[in-house]
Structure formats: C-alpha cells, structure tokens
C-alpha cells in the first residue's frame, strides 16, 4: 500500500531511477519510484550497454548477453588494428528489460514503493 508521505519521489524507473531509489532507501529515506509506463523495461529506450563498474555495483550478471572487450579493425591492405584487450571487459551488453527490472527490484527489496502507469504533470 502506498503512503501519503515520502522523503523522496524519483521520477522514472529506468536503471538510473531504480539505482537512485535503491541507494536512497539504503540510507534510510522513504522513496516512491514513479514510472509512466505499465511495465518496467518497456518500451526500449536505448541499447543495453553497461560499463563494468556499474555492473559491479548492481551485480545483475544474469542479464548479460555478451561481453565486449573492444574491436578488431582491418585496413584495406589487411593490417589488423586491435582496439582494447580481449582479456579485459570494456562493457557488458545486457537484456535491457531484465536489467531494468533487476535494478528496480533492488530498490523495492530495500523498501521503496513503485507506482506504474503514472505520469507526473505538476509538483509543488
């Protein structure tokens, strides 16, 4: 059941909003997370690229589709140019829907409330 009073209202239940709500609830604040859509992670907003430090904070490795270490480029003459290191992860490609859900779930598990299908139009 939703409260009538919150310390913080976070607008947008994407990865950043979910992470912010999680951290705020961990610090003891009451948080309402508001999302205009009826489902977390839909519609898709952007590609699912998560840098290693963010993934380490979230720990949602079960959402990873592939690891990206860099690229191999080839000149017209066939010379290979290596960008990055195959032994080092530069970014993770994730399933955005699952990743978004996982981040929001962290905030809910910490005590945040979630309000879906709600679009704020005014604040005082």
Model segments located where?
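Beta1/beta-strand and adjacent pyrophosphate-binding region of the FAD-binding site
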Residues: 1-16, 32
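Glycine-rich FAD pyrophosphate-binding loop
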Residues: 9, 22-45
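Fold-independent oxyanion-binding glycine-rich loops
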Residues: 13, 36-37, 76, 118
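Residues within well-ordered alpha helices
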Residues: 23, 54-57, 106
């Amino acid at each position: 059941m939703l409260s009538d009073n919150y310390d913080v209202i976070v607008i947008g239940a994407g990865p950043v909003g979910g992470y912010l709500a999680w951290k705020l609830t961990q610090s003891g604040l009451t948080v309402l997370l508001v999302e205009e859509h009826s489902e977390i992670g839909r519609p898709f907003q952007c590609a699912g690229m998560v840098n290693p430090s963010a993934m380490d904070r979230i720990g949602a490795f079960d959402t990873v589709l592939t690891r990206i270490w860099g690229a191999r480029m080839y000149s017209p003459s066939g010379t290979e140019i290596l960008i990055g290191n195959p032994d080092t992860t530069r970014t993770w490609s994730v399933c955005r829907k699952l990743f978004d859900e996982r981040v929001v779930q962290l905030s809910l598990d910490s005590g945040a409330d979630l309000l879906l299908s709600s679009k704020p139009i005014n604040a005082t």
